[in-house]
């Protein structure tokens, strides 16, 4: 349950991490749009979020990974290689297995990957809520923008960005990568 603080003329509702995640999950297309309204014809929502944030996707170098199988493996291998070579490396993958924060990580000094902090997720979501309500982006579009903002704030040397569903309308396509990697492509599901 959110904490509520009342001050003269102001009411502040502070979201918890779980409140924030619950709010983000309401943006999943299955909850927010049905039928023809769920069809995504362009990248306008992702562009709008990135513009609202000052275009964080243009503040770091990236490698874009796409394909039917092996994206996660290739992404993690490249992250390990860049980290071992001394680069501060961001990693964006999907979906997560247990915790939303698994999607957005940065290579740490200890050699492991550090997940995006809960407080960043909360603060980011609160900050862009007006834009979310205005443009009605999907969960994935918000998550992509969050990853880009986190990587820009943390000044990563390079970010490894895995596509979601892939294709020309994948939200990750707003980046201009240094390199694109295509794993095998085949019929899926």
Where are these regions (language model features)?
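Short functional linear segments
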Residues: 12-67, 74-76, 80, 84
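ATP-dependent carboxylate-amine ligase catalytic core
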Residues: 36-43, 48-60, 84-175, 187
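Conserved phosphate-binding and hydrolysis motifs of nucleotide-dependent enzymes
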Residues: 67-70, 162
């Amino acid at each position: 349950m959110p904490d509520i603080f009342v001050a003269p003329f102001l009411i502040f509702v502070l979201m918890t991490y779980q409140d924030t995640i619950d709010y983000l999950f309401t943006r999943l297309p299955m909850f927010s749009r049905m039928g023809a309204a769920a069809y995504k014809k362009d990248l306008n929502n992702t562009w709008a979020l990135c513009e609202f944030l000052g275009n964080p996707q243009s503040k770091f170098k990236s490698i874009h990974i796409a394909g039917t199988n092996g994206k996660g493996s290739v992404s993690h291998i490249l992250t390990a290689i860049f980290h071992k070579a001394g680069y501060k490396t961001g990693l964006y993958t999907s979906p997560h297995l247990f915790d939303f924060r698994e999607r957005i990580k940065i290579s740490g000094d200890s050699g492991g990957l550090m997940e995006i902090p809960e407080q960043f997720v909360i603060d980011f979501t609160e900050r862009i809520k007006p834009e979310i309500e205005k443009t009605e982006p999907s969960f994935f579009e918000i998550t992509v923008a969050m990853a880009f903002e986190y990587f820009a704030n943390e000044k990563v040397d390079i970010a490894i960005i895995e596509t979601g569903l892939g294709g020309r309308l994948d939200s990750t396509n707003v980046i201009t990568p240094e390199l694109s990697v295509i794993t095998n492509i085949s019929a899926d599901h």
